[in-house]
Amino acid sequence: MTQDELKKAVGWAALDYVKPGTIVGVGTGSTAAHFIDALGSIKHQIEGAVSSSDASTAKLKSYGIPVFDCNDVDVLDIYVDGADEINGQMQMIKGGGAALTREKIIAAIARKFICIADESKQVGVLGKFPLPVEVIPMARSYVARELIKLGGLPEYRQNVLTDNGNVILDVHNLSILDAIALENQINGIAGVVTVGLFANRGADVALIGTANGVKVIG
């Protein structure tokens, strides 16, 4: 199976966790896009969705799925999203698609976070994939200097603005042994909106696409 076929398999497998009549939290990226395709097939069974990006909102609306403002929803039954990396503790690096802040907000109000990914995203130690950090534009240089002090090599993601109007620094050269501590440390830097470490709030279930089918963890 190709990588895209593995992503499609886990996107459709996530339908098993969607309860009729609920509002579903939906992530961003190529794997989440397959979940939206799957969700379109049962759109009349759900109340709607909360979306983590303008791109996902547009795709949901193209299927006629109502999209709710996060402020109008107290709690979500599930949140389904991909990951750039996921370790054995169900901690993730996310934000390759620059939607990390909204993804983290939706994860916070969801009872269950379901990570959908192909097997290439499974790692022993987080950090080979550059760690995205969303930053207020005026703080970009300061935050970069602080990230260097932590041992990282930050790279400004050129020509990218988040849906919130901020910039992204991708931090290379990190071997993340204590993801919770690093998440808290980077989030404490003035000017950081959030870091793409999902460790304090990791995944509850991981659906991993493999050549032998979908592996369920959690």
Swiss-Prot record:
Enzyme superclass (EC): isomerase
Gene Ontology cellular component terms for the protein in this record: cytosol
Biological processes, Gene Ontology terms: D-ribose metabolic process; pentose-phosphate shunt, non-oxidative branch
Pathway(s) served: Carbohydrate degradation; pentose phosphate pathway; D-ribose 5-phosphate from D-ribulose 5-phosphate (non-oxidative stage): step 1/1
UniProt catalytic activity: aldehydo-D-ribose 5-phosphate = D-ribulose 5-phosphate
Record keywords, A-Z: Isomerase
Molecular function (Gene Ontology), one example: ribose-5-phosphate isomerase activity
Record Pfam families: Rib_5-P_isom_A
UniProt-listed CDD domains: RPI_A (cd01398)
Residues reported to bind substrate: 28-31, 81-84, 94-97, 121
Record bears the keyword Oxidoreductase: no
Active site residues according to the UniProt entry: 103
EC number: 5.3.1.6
Family: Belongs to the ribose 5-phosphate isomerase family.
Function: Catalyzes the reversible conversion of ribose-5-phosphate to ribulose 5-phosphate.
Quaternary structure, from the entry: Homodimer.
Protein name: Ribose-5-phosphate isomerase A 1
Organism field: Yersinia pestis
Gene name in the database record: rpiA1
